[in-house]
Regions:
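Iron-sulfur-associated redox domains of electron-transfer enzymes in respiratory
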Residues: 1-181
Length: 181
C-alpha cells in the first residue's frame, strides 16, 4: 500500500507473486468446490492477520485483481480463546490428524527475509520498519540503488511476526518460528 500511495512509479517493479495465504485460500476454495461440497459463493476464507498491513493488503493488493480471501481479523483477538477451545474440545483430536503443516518456506514467509529466502534470492536487501522501508523506496525511486536484485520491505520490525496484532512477543515468535522451520 505504501508503494501504491507514495511511490506509484515503482508499482511496475513489484513482483507479481501470490502470498502463501492467498495460494492456500485459492487451493482450499477450489478443492471444496471440486468435491461438490460447496458452491464458490458458499466458501468463506478468513485470514488471521499479524498486522493491519497484511489485513488491508487483502483488498488493496498490488499483485492481484481479486482475492480468494473473504476477510481478515487479528490473531491477538482470537488466540487465547482458540487455544482454550482446542485444549478443551475432545473432537479436535478426531480431525487433528488431517491437519497439515505448511512448508518451511511458507511458514518463514512472515519473518524478515522470508520472502527472499523462499524465492532463493541471495542478493536481496531486507528492510523492516515503516520509516526504513520509506527511505529505501525513496532511494529506489530516485534511481540511487543499483547493486540489489530484490528488495523485501516489511512495515513491522522483524517482519510480520513482529506485527502489532500478533499474539506473542516478536522475539518469542521468532524463536518459535526458527524451531519449526
Amino acid at each position: 500500500r505504501l508503494i501504491q500511495v507514495k511511490f506509484p512509479e515503482l508499482i511496475k517493479q513489484v513482483v507479481p507473486i501470490l502470498s502463501p495465504a492467498e495460494a492456500a485460500a485459492i487451493y482450499i476454495k477450489e478443492e471444496l468446490v471440486k468435491r461438490g461440497e460447496y458452491s464458490p459463493e458458499q466458501v468463506g476464507i478468513w485470514f488471521v492477520a499479524p498486522c493491519p498491513a497484511k489485513g488491508s493488503n487483502i483488498r488493496q493488493a498490488v499483485d492481484v485483481n481479486s482475492t480468494a480471501i473473504t476477510g481478515a481479523f487479528s490473531i491477538s483477538k482470537i488466540y487465547g480463546e482458540l487455544c482454550r477451545v482446542l485444549k478443551e474440545d475432545a473432537s479436535f483430536s478426531d480431525w487433528q490428524d488431517h491437519v497439515t503443516t505448511g512448508s518451511s518456506y511458507g511458514m518463514g514467509w512472515g519473518a524478515a527475509g522470508g520472502e527472499a529466502k523462499a524465492a532463493g534470492i541471495d542478493n536481496a536487501l531486507i528492510v523492516h520498519g515503516v520509516d526504513e522501508a520509506y527511505e529505501v523506496l525513496e532511494q529506489i525511486s530516485m534511481n540511487k540503488m543499483h547493486d540489489v536484485d530484490y528488495v523485501e520491505c516489511s512495515a513491522c520490525y522483524g517482519g510480520c511476526i513482529g506485527g502489532p496484532l500478533t499474539a506473542v512477543n516478536k522475539f518469542v515468535a521468532e524463536k518459535n518460528l526458527q524451531q519449526r522451520v
